[in-house]
Design a protein with these regions (language model features):
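HotDog/MaoC-like acyl-thioester-processing domains
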Residues: 38-109, 195-254
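Generic detection of short hydrophobic beta-strand segments and adjacent strand-loop junctions
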Residues: 31, 74, 117-119, 191, ...
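Hydrophobic beta-strand-centered segment that forms part of the acyl-chain substrate-binding groove
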Residues: 6-49, 53-56, 161-211, 223, ...
Length: 254
């Protein structure tokens, strides 16, 4: 099935229209995923035409038959407002008895911090995403002129959905261990540009931290914040929050 950040590319032209070039330098997209999408299913994305008084627009995506795919918010920094994931994290109940995620703690930092990463146009991005940015651009759901050639920032920009790939590229070094085998899925994601955009062929550092752990009747969830820093200046360029949920029923020892 499509890993949900695929849908983020469909929002970019709409959000560029609403927010202008600032979307690429300090835009924030925050989404809660509702239903899975498999290859070949059509997905329509929707964005409010103008920001509300807090500077925020609501975003959503649905399948052709109306099945909701995601709901969320988009906004500009430096204020950003209360994002979709901010709202959801504020409502989390602390969990006392995690099983699958029992080896994790809130505040835990990645053992590989800082992890060195970059994305070249032809670079294979690992086993989880076995393709290059160039291959992605040939098949991307919705392309943008800033992904190739010259841009206001010099060279090509890393596409919004590929920022997720960049931050997952070295995730094996984090030391964040869960018990398994069990079935996990992306439940939500937020990509916040602080001093963007992130560029192809630039060196970055990643710092990871677990910012929340939670559970529902069916799942255990972790919320991992990854900061993306410029390798030279050590300045924070972007922050990504990934909420991963693991199905309790899929773990044999539950």
């Amino acid at each position: 099935y499509k890993r949900q950040p695929t849908h983020f590319s469909q929002f970019v032209p709409l959000l560029h229209e609403v927010f202008g070039d600032e979307w690429f330098t300090k835009g924030c997209i925050s989404a809660h995923y509702q239903n899975m999408v498999v290859e070949g299913e059509e997905v329509q994305t929707m964005v409010e035409k103008a920001p509300d008084s807090s500077g925020m627009v609501a975003i959503s995506a649905q399948k052709r038959d109306g099945t909701p795919v995601l709901t969320g918010t988009a906004s500009l920094g430096p204020d950003y407002g209360e994002t979709e994931l901010d709202k959801r994290m504020a409502k989390l109940r602390p969990s006392s008895q995690l099983v699958i995620l029992s080896d994790l703690t809130v505040g835990q930092k990645g053992t590989g911090n800082p992890e060195s990463v970059r994305m070249d146009m032809d670079q294979h991005m690992g086993d989880m995403y076995p393709f290059s940015n160039k291959q992605k651009l040939e098949k991307i759901t919705e392309t943008h002129e800033f992904y190739e050639g010259e841009t206001p920032w010099g060279g090509p920009v890393i596409p919004l959905e590929m920022i997720s790939v960049l931050t997952q590229y070295t995730s094996g070094r984090s030391g964040f261990r869960s018990r398994g085998p069990a079935i996990g899925l992306f439940a939500g994601q937020q990509i916040k540009m602080i001093d963007g955009p992130l560029m192809i062929r630039k060196d970055y550092l990643l710092e990871r931290e677990i910012i929340a752990l939670s559970e529902s009747r069916r799942t255990e969830s972790n919320w991992i914040l990854t900061r993306v820093l410029c390798a030279d200046s050590k300045k924070v360029k972007a922050e990504v929050i990934l909420n991963s949920a693991t199905l309790k029923d899929s773990y044999a020892n539950y």
